[in-house]
UniProtKB/Swiss-Prot annotation:
Fusion peptide: region residues: 577-599
Protein name: Envelope glycoprotein gp130
Site positions per UniProt: Not glycosylated: 25
Annotated motif Endoplasmic reticulum retention signal, positions: 985-987
GO cellular component: host cell endoplasmic reticulum membrane; membrane; viral envelope; virion membrane
Glycosylation sites: 109, 141, 183, 286, 311, 346, 391, 405, 423, 528, 557, 783, 809, 834
Consequence the record notes for mutating residue 13 to A: Complete loss of particle release
TM helices/strands, residue ranges: 66-88, 962-982
This protein's UniProt keywords: Cleavage on pair of basic residues, Glycoprotein, Host endoplasmic reticulum, Host membrane, Isopeptide bond, Membrane, Signal-anchor, Transmembrane, Transmembrane helix, Ubl conjugation, Viral envelope protein, Virion
Topological domain ranges for the Cytoplasmic compartment: 1-65, 983-989
Modifications the protein undergoes after translation, according to the UniProt entry: Envelope glycoproteins are synthesized as an inactive precursor that is processed by host furin or a furin-like protease to yield a functional hetero-oligomeric complex.
Site (Cleavage): 126-127, 572-573
Length: 989
């Protein structure tokens, strides 16, 4: 293609064209003249005018076909830009009009009833193949829900916290004390020990030890008292004036029943039976009683040498069975504890030695039985060791013939009631045991008679003989049930003026100087002086003789594991404790962090209880049990097992077993009513911070459990509550289905008396009751007050929309975008049917019982909401939410804030056909003609154009930013190219 001509060439070419056109139309000029004229034009000096230059400029711009096409392309692009700009401008104008158009009005409070008649086929009896449709009438009751909110009963009371108090309790469990209270045998004691160890070990296996900032409980006076009271409360040391043993090997105590199995009435096992010498008729040859039992008689009791040691100087006993009348077994353990402490404080003077008036007359000439009682006649049966080791004299109660020189011939003289007893029929009307001896002299001497050659099995003939079937002869005689020849003789054993020490008082004094650990260590060793701990013996048998013991014992330094000091101990770091708590999942409102709230106890309202609430509360388990002394052995163990298992279960669930905490004491300290205490006890939480075994032996065990309690003190308790269930409403506007819900400022409606209160809860936990830090009283949504307007949230949903929730009363909560069973669409309704029917593809069943109206149903103020026309589209755009309130001013404010988001549609960032169709739907109610045109364009682009271009056309939506960038670059290049065609200087050609 030839390049464009220069200006001179173009002017000459233009003149030659004009000359050629002029010469073609004339006949007067010859050919030679024409050639001459052309040559003159070519040789003529050209002087271009402005008009020539302008025309030449136009020539250069369109000199070639490519330049013409470029101009055409540029014009088309400019035309498209103009058209698109006009379209966008018109669309923006239309969007602004659509925004300002008000949409639907939501108005709840609609109640209606319908009779639904589904067709149900019924088989005719005469034709098994024929089925005929018959109408079935189903009554459907529909009640719309005000403001789209359903209220269901909230059964849990709502408790508002006033403050949180922390409280520590140390629970001590000593199986020996429990066994003594229940009078258990050694075999049952072992079972009890195993049971306690099993339950406590299982609790310890799932608990971790950590510290609380309340100090070491072992430095607390109450802990020291409880610990030592549990170990040494009834332990005493008696010092003889001069060591003297029991004078004889034998003991006559005919007032005690004999052992054995007898028909009829049986007696409880007596401790003295351990020393009974049974009468046996088969003995070795030449066997005598003296050879084995000394002066003791067969059929009586033998005192072993261990109780008759010559050099025994002290008696150590741990028993409550020698106390005088002030100690009543019918009292509770706490009452007896209080009485005992008062006695010990009054009967000691800063030392562990008891005053003389605390002792019985038999022990001291100045005794007044202030603490201990006199030993009675029957004590030898149940407490033989106490009589043998502590009595200064003994009165034998004998029914043996020959004692006191009583014989059969003298019975009539000794007992007036027996005068002439054997000479008349009086004996037929008296007791068969009356007026005779228990043991009669049958032989002149005791001897054995053997067969020839027999030395091991010979017949033995005792000096006294009588059938043992009369096992309760002496006891009945002592009760004076019949006249008998009783011989009572006094035996002087040892001198008076005993000196008695209280081990509990010794602990009280020594622990202040040496510490509780050292004192416990020394005194426990002292109780184990003979190899068997005295406090682990049965109460009635816990009496042992000691040979010159050192008392008070020495108190060596005992290294103890401190709980508060970090020096010289098995370090349990705080960080490790926190890590353990987190790993174990403890969450007692922050576990250890909550312990800092113990400072709340400094409230002035609790001044009288500060020292109690701040220190550890020490509790003995045996003091909290029922009276187990009336139970038999296994029943007492089962009773304790039930208590322990319940305690363990409660602690694992972080609850409090109030059996072991005095709620009366706590109520006095907190000054709360009974109803408030019920709530406090119900919502209180517990946390075990240590479980340890403090003593272990085959027949006894002792444990300590450290418990931390978190007590929530209520400020207010809301009852009769209703829970808010926000269902919402459906709105279809601008071709979009929208789920609209009101953001109510409350979660609970409370009805107290006649006042309805709307509550907003903050920082709540659910522990049986709902416990909240903050509860605010707010106003409901309504048109009456500008301050009560509530935001409305809109969310785009897809059609069809069906939401059916069955309610507890047998009704159904329905929200649907369509109608079925004459249930209205868009409106949330409570539907109740009287027969089973199918609606929305689901079976609606009648309630099991007739529907009952509640006495109180929350009532809300009437509320009408007018929503913007484009509320559905607003909600659909990238999840944007618009807040719409019930006042017109608020709506305008919300619309202004939403305009910026709505006008983003002008800068299209999505699928073009969908955007145009959305615009058409929004314009339909405002400008139907424009909406039809836009709908047609959108349908063409999404339908026909999609079919023509296929996937490539749809990809343009994703490649649009790239294509626009490339197009802009090409357009700039084209413009620069066209500009370069314009001559800026004279060309030589």
């Amino acid at each position: 293609m030839a390049p464009p001509m220069t200006l001179q060439q173009w002017i000459i070419w233009k003149k030659m064209n004009k000359a050629h056109e002029a010469l073609q139309n004339t006949t007067t000029v010859t050919e030679q003249q024409k050639e001459q004229i052309i040559l003159d034009i070519q040789n003529e000096e050209v002087q271009p005018t402005r008009r020539d230059k302008f025309r030449y400029l136009l020539y250069t711009c369109c000199a070639t076909s490519s330049r013409v096409l470029a101009w055409m392309f540029l014009v088309c692009i400019l035309l498209i830009i103009v058209l698109v700009s006009c379209f966008v401008t018109i669309s923006r104008i239309q969007w602004n009009k659509d925004i300002q158009v008000l949409g639907p009005v939501i108005d709840w409070n609609v109640t209606q009833r319908a009779v639904y008649q589904p067709l149900q086929t019924r088989r005719i009896a005469r034709s098994l193949r024929m089925q005929h449709p018959v109408p079935k009438y189903v009554e459907v009751n529909m009640t719309s829900i005000p403001q789209g909110v359903y209220y269901e009963p909230h059964p849990e009371p709502i408790v508002v916290k006033e403050r949180v108090l922390g409280l520590s309790q140390i629970l001590m469990i000593n199986s020996e004390n429990i066994a003594n209270n229940a009078n258990l045998t050694q075999e049952v004691k072992k079972l009890l020990t195993e049971m306690v160890n099993e339950e406590m070990q299982s609790l310890s296996d799932v608990m971790i030890d950590f510290e609380i900032p309340l100090g070491d409980p072992r430095d607390q006076e109450q802990y020291i008292h409880r610990k030592c009271y549990q170990e040494f409360a009834n332990c005493y040391l008696v010092k003889y004036k001069e060591p003297k043993p029991w004078p004889k090997e034998g003991l006559i105590a005919d007032q005690c029943p004999l052992p054995g199995y007898h028909a009829g009435l049986t007696y409880n096992r007596q401790s003295i039976w351990d020393y009974y010498i049974k009468v046996e008729s088969i003995r070795p040859a030449n066997w005598t009683t003296k050879s084995k039992y000394g002066q003791a008689r067969l059929g009586s009791f033998y005192i072993p040498s261990s109780l008759r040691q010559i050099n025994v100087s002290h008696v150590l006993f741990c028993s409550d069975q020698l106390y005088s009348k002030w100690y009543n077994i019918e009292n509770t353990i706490e009452q007896n504890e209080r009485f005992l402490l008062n006695k010990l404080n009054n009967l000691t003077s800063g030392t562990s030695v008891l005053k003389k008036r605390a002792l019985p007359k038999d022990w001291s000439s100045q005794g007044k039985n202030a603490l201990f009682r006199e030993i009675n006649v029957l004590d030898i049966c149940s407490k033989p060791e106490s009589v043998i080791l502590l009595n200064t004299s003994y009165y034998s109660f004998s029914l043996w013939e020959g004692d006191c020189n009583f014989t059969k011939d003298m019975i009539s003289q000794l007992v007036p009631e027996c005068d002439g007893f054997y000479n008349n029929s009086k004996w037929m009307h008296m007791h068969p045991y009356a007026c005779r001896f228990w043991r009669s002299k049958k032989n002149e001497k005791e001897e054995t008679k053997c067969r020839d050659g027999e030395t091991k099995r010979c017949l033995y003939y005792p000096l006294w003989d009588s059938p043992e079937s009369t096992y309760d002869f002496g006891y009945l005689a002592y009760q004076k049930n019949f006249p008998s020849p009783i011989c009572i003789e006094q035996q002087k054993i040892r001198d008076q003026d005993y000196e008695v020490y209280s081990l509990y008082q010794e602990r009280k004094i020594a622990s202040k100087a040496y510490g509780i650990d050292t004192v416990l260590f020394s005194l426990k060793n002292f109780l184990n002086y003979t190899g068997t701990p005295v406090n682990e013996m049965p109460n009635a048998r816990a009496f042992v003789g000691l040979i010159d013991p050192k008392f008070p014992p020495s108190y060596p330094n005992v290294t103890r594991e401190h709980y508060t000091s970090c020096n010289n101990r098995k370090r349990r770091s705080v960080d490790n404790n926190y890590a353990k708590l987190r790993s174990m999942g403890y969450a007692l409102t922050g576990a250890v962090q909550t312990l800092s709230q113990i400072s709340d106890i400094n409230d002035e309202n609790l001044q009288q209880g500060i020292y109690l609430l701040r220190d550890h509360v020490i509790t003995l388990m045996e003091a909290t049990l029922h009276d187990i002394s009336v139970m038999e052995g296994m029943f007492a163990v089962q009773h304790l097992h039930t208590h322990l298992n319940h305690l363990k279960t409660m602690l694992l669930e972080r609850r409090i077993d109030w059996t072991y905490m005095s709620s009366t004491w706590l109520q006095q300290q907190l000054q709360k009513s009974d109803d408030e205490m019920k709530v406090i006890k119900r919502i209180a939480r517990s946390l075990v911070y240590y479980v340890k075994q403090t003593h272990s032996s085959p027949t006894a065990t002792a444990w300590e459990i450290g418990l931390y309690y978190e007590l929530v003190i209520p400020k207010h308790i809301y009852l009769n509550n209703w829970n808010v269930v926000n269902i919402g409403h459906l709105v279809k506007s601008a071709g979009q289905l929208t789920h609209v819900t009101i953001a109510h400022p409350y979660e609970i409606i409370n009805k107290e008396c006649v006042e309805t209160i709307y509550l907003h809860l903050e920082d709540c936990t659910r522990q049986d009751y709902v416990i909240c830090d903050v509860v605010k009283i707010v106003q409901p949504c309504g048109n009456s007050s500008d301050t009560s307007d509530c935001p409305v949230w809109a969310e785009a949903v897809k059609e069809p929309f069906v939401q059916v929730n069955p309610l507890k009363n047998g009704s159904y909560l329905v929200l649907a975008s369509s109608t079925d069973c004459q249930i209205p669409p868009y409106v949330p309704s409570i539907v109740t049917v009287n027969e089973t029917t199918s609606c929305f593809g689901l079976d609606f069943k009648r309630p099991l019982v007739a529907e009952e109206r509640l006495s109180f149903e929350p009532r809300l103020p009437n509320l009408q909401l007018r929503l913007p026309h484009l509320v559905g589209i607003i909600a659909k755009i990238k999840g944007i939410k618009i807040e719409v309130t019930s006042s017109g001013e608020s709506i305008k404010e919300q619309i202004e804030r939403a305009k910026a988001e709505l006008l983003r549609l002008d800068i299209h960032e999505g699928d073009t056909p969908a955007w145009i169709q959305q615009l058409a739907a929004a314009t339909k109610d405002v400008w139907p003609a424009a909406a039809s045109a836009l709908q047609g364009i959108g349908n063409f682009l999404s339908g026909t154009a999609q079919g023509i271009f296929g996937t490539a056309f749809s990809l343009l939506g994703y490649l649009k930013p790239i294509l626009i960038g490339v197009g802009v670059i090409l357009l700039v290049i084209l413009i620069f190219k066209i500009v370069s065609w314009i001559p800026t200087k004279k060309k030589n050609q």
